[in-house]
């Protein structure tokens, strides 16, 4: 019995402390599903957040394309009442990998995306509680985003994402630029 225990300990030690083999990552044709979310416009209010879902595919030279949808909710204060701006956007973009570690566990990418969507202010209700009327209304949006993203492989099929993003959307009535800080999870499906 003691001999079996020592052989088990030796096998585990060899498995843990010998060189590791990593699965191939960032191969052309690999695809993943992303779930992401975070803070929008800083973390000034509890209602300033975004969430989204995307599909990404890897190309030659370890770059990738992204197509997805996002929901952003931002809070504006008016006389101690929240006026909400909600944006529903679709995204199509391309990310260039410019840094990775030798073990292919960490990847840093920069990307640009085209965005199109719809914005609603105070869910279409233009009359405020005190009788004043909102000048900002619902509108269609168009623009783009610049993203810096860090990908960390937790396993060969599960990836943790961290990103900083600046969105510029025209057509709305409440400002053009929105900064986002977020985390995400990507599942490699192919």
List where the protein language model places each region.
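Short glycine/proline- and aromatic-enriched beta-strand/turn motifs that initiate or cap beta-hairpins
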Residues: 21-74, 182, 186-190
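Polar/charged side chains located within well-ordered beta-strands of beta-rich proteins
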Residues: 35-37, 63-67, 92-96, 149, ...
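Extracellular loop and loop/strand-boundary signature of outer-membrane beta-barrel proteins
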Residues: 38-41, 76-83, 130-136, 168-172
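Cleavable N-terminal export/targeting peptides
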Residues: 1-28
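Gram-negative (and chloroplast) outer-membrane scaffold detector with strong preference
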Residues: 54-129, 187-190
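Outer-envelope beta-barrel architecture signal
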Residues: 24-33, 61-65, 104-110, 140, ...
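Residues that define the transmembrane beta-barrel architecture of outer-membrane proteins
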Residues: 29-31, 45-51, 82-90, 106, ...
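Predominantly the C-terminal beta-signal and adjacent terminal strand-loop region
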Residues: 72-74, 144-190
